[in-house]
Amino acid sequence: MKHLASSIALTLLLPAVQAQQTVWGQCGGQGWSGPTSCVAGAACSTLNPYYAQCIPGATATSTTLTTTTAATTTSQTTTKPTTTGPTTSAPTVTASGNPFSGYQLYANPYYSSEVHTLAMPSLPSSLQPKASAVAEVPSFVWLDVAAKVPTMGTYLADIQAKNKAGANPPIAGIFVVYDLPDRDCAALASNGEYSIANNGVANYKAYIDAIRAQLVKYSDVHTILVIEPDSLANLVTNLNVAKCANAQSAYLECVDYALKQLNLPNVAMYLDAGHAGWLGWPANLGPAATLFAKVYTDAGSPAAVRGLATNVANYNAWSLSTCPSYTQGDPNCDEKKYINAMAPLLKEAGFDAHFIMDTSRNGVQPTKQNAWGDWCNVIGTGFGVRPSTNTGDPLQDAFVWIKPGGESDGTSNSTSPRYDAHCGYSDALQPAPEAGTWFQAYFEQLLTNANPSF
């Protein structure tokens, strides 16, 4: 918004017909002053209030990409999604031990629809079968606005129907709870819908209540949740940021509420715990363990809280024989070292935690990050190991895909209200759209560099 005046002045000088935006380019959104029409063969589709994108083969629209696509990518594909709830006689499943053992994970239909309708039409034919295979990899569904919670019910109903039809092994639902008020307090790219100053805590509790209602309705569906990426980690290292300091008590109150309300027999939860390059440093490790354990015990040590999730939307390796130069000074240069350093401190404080790791974008090691803290759309990355419980470490429950690969980390447009400088760094792929929207060039990068390959 700081460039609004200059944008208005520039608009007065523009010719009557503006240049058309190229395929995948931005064509609208809050604060956008560039082209609003697309080249032939593409249409301007509004994906969220901040971003509209020229999508090939699409028709102009002012709604978000549908999240109720019937496409499914699990091995059982004969049962269409249904919104019918379970019968009163449906048994409640109980999560105990490693919640991933004995289950296959639900392949996110929304992500599958992005790959099939956004990515594949413009890919070279040689990459299309590989992209189709990516769409079949289970990835977490992000409940990043309250409006997506009903879709959770649609997916749980679909899982329930498939399980009743004999899915073997049974399917588990996988979701990210991500809607704190004043979210992303130390950055700008993923600011959310709720403000602490505008009834944000109450709104968040209503959001959690709605999630709980879905989980109770589908009590026979085993469901795994990742709770609030970046939130608690920001309270360890970024209280010098005014927005984080102001949000501290609200974050703690909201996360506490989530852990208590979602502590259900059919649920397993993992609190987000940043990553090795954030909280693995010796100065951060102890305070982080203290905070995570306190949050866990203050919530009553909920049975459904299994442990911590690391490397969410990040790029770190699981296990390295040689630490990259950008990790210098941190003995915990990979996620295996990080969790094995963290676990004893947690246990001593009353939290016998297990871990999961996001491997969706860590296929290339070492990364091409200029600095370990560079997080936005990093160049040269590739899809990593597929979801698996074969981790080789008793602390590590599973490798999973939490970040949907191909969705942007943040915009490189410096005039955007949600622009974060990290997205303009030399090691960030540009031009990039708003956080959460489709980034075709990034998907192609991940696909081309996938390790193991597709």
Curated annotation (Swiss-Prot):
EC number(s) stated in the UniProt entry for this protein: 3.2.1.91
Disulfide bonds: C27-C44, C38-C54, C185-C244, C376-C423
Active site per database record: D184, D230 (proton donor), D409 (nucleophile)
PANTHER family found in the cross-reference section: 1,4-BETA-D-GLUCAN CELLOBIOHYDROLASE C-RELATED, PTHR34876
Domain notes: Has a modular structure: a carbohydrate-binding module (CBM) at the N-terminus, a linker rich in threonines, and a C-terminal exocellobiohydrolase catalytic module. The genes for catalytic modules and CBMs seem to have evolved separately and have been linked by gene fusion.
Protein name stated in the entry: Probable 1,4-beta-D-glucan cellobiohydrolase C
Start and end residues of each stretch annotated as Disordered: 68-95
Pfam families hit by this protein: CBM_1, Glyco_hydro_6
Signal peptide feature range: 1-19
Keyword Transmembrane helix: no
Glycosylation sites recorded in the entry for this protein: N413
Family (UniProt): Belongs to the glycosyl hydrolase 6 (cellulase B) family.
Thr-rich linker as annotated region, ranges: 59-94
Subcellular localization(s) per the UniProt record: Secreted
Domain of life according to the entry: Eukaryota
Region (Catalytic): 95-454
GO MF entries: cellulose 1,4-beta-cellobiosidase activity; cellulose binding
Physiological role: The biological conversion of cellulose to glucose generally requires three types of hydrolytic enzymes: (1) Endoglucanases which cut internal beta-1,4-glucosidic bonds; (2) Exocellobiohydrolases that cut the disaccharide cellobiose from the non-reducing end of the cellulose polymer chain; (3) Beta-1,4-glucosidases which hydrolyze the cellobiose and other short cello-oligosaccharides to glucose.
Ranges for domain CBM1: 20-55
GO aspect biological process, one term: cellulose catabolic process
Alphabetic keyword roster: Carbohydrate metabolism, Cellulose degradation, Disulfide bond, Glycoprotein, Glycosidase, Hydrolase, Polysaccharide degradation, Secreted, Signal
